[in-house]
Amino acid sequence: MRESPARIILRVALLWVVTWVLIPATASADQLTVYPARRIITMDPSLPTATAVAVRDDRIVAVGTMETLQPWLEAFDYEIDETFRDKVLLPGFIDPHLHPDLAVSLLARNEIITPEDWDLPSGFIEGVTDRAGYLARLQELVDRDPDSDKAFFTWGYNAFWHGLITRQDLDAISATRPIVVTQRSSHEVVLNTAALEAAQISEEAAARVSDGVDWEAGRFWERGQSVVQGGIRRYLRDPDSGSDGLALVADLIHRGGVTTISTAGSAPRPGSATWTAFDAERIPFRTLIVPRPGGFNRRPGATLSEKFENDKATNTGRMIYTKGIKFMLDGAMFAQYMQMGPPGYIDG
């Protein structure tokens, strides 16, 4: 059924009124930047595609075509930026589970040997997808400085590609230099004999942990990592390594097209290194923070709702505490350590 001309005019008039109402009254002093594009994929079912977007103070204020943006252009000063005239634009990605501090530890303080490729500012690292290739790459990296007495750290090992790596494999790489291998999920570490000795980790201490430890294989996972974490940090790690790691992580987030991340369980506080780095003016993404629930009730009478309000009061435009909490109930997904009921993992 075709609409009458009067009905069409009324609908267009209403659209213009709504558009004007939505324009903030405080915007008059701010210039718009309009970006025409070959195509804009909005991911909004009511307007799936567009060809122009208007931005003010780093925020999108309108999306549509140059014609539908006319109310804005007539009301405010603007400039046309042709940078994306022949490009296709789409919203930024969301990474719902990223720990910046952990990313610093893994990417900036380890040699990377993973199944997937990594394209870092420092260079391209080709992935390794079999056991022989992994051990060969590890030997090559350790041999670059064979006389060093500094501990060698590597991250990215995954048994589903590289087979089970044990203390004996690492002893064959070097019987004198401490080697610490961190699994791809970071929920497991493997140490050679030299590393166990240098970190002052004893078999007696390992025996006091009921699960997550294979002493003979030098493997420590999930709860078992508590046996070795203190010794690694105290005796093996260089405290100054990875000092610029947050800048690297921020760069990788940006390069990946991610505009929102969520860190669950590890909650940076105002004034911390992570908060300061990720709340800087140059950072083009937001960080949503989902803290653990523990600790809020250490003060008598404290409530979880009070904690939420106190956290929310610290929010900025980039660092945002949510009303969610993270419970630590299970094992790592990447390492397939989740405690699954029957039939367990059905995809291998």
Where do the protein language model's features map onto the residues?
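Bacterial N-terminal signal peptides that target proteins for export
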Residues: 2-14
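Selective for proline/serine-rich intrinsically disordered segments
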Residues: 2-3, 22, 34
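Divalent metal-binding segments
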Residues: 31-37, 41, 45-306, 314, ...
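Bacterial N-terminal signal peptides
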Residues: 11-24
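Boundary at the C-terminal end of the N-terminal hydrophobic targeting segment
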Residues: 27-29
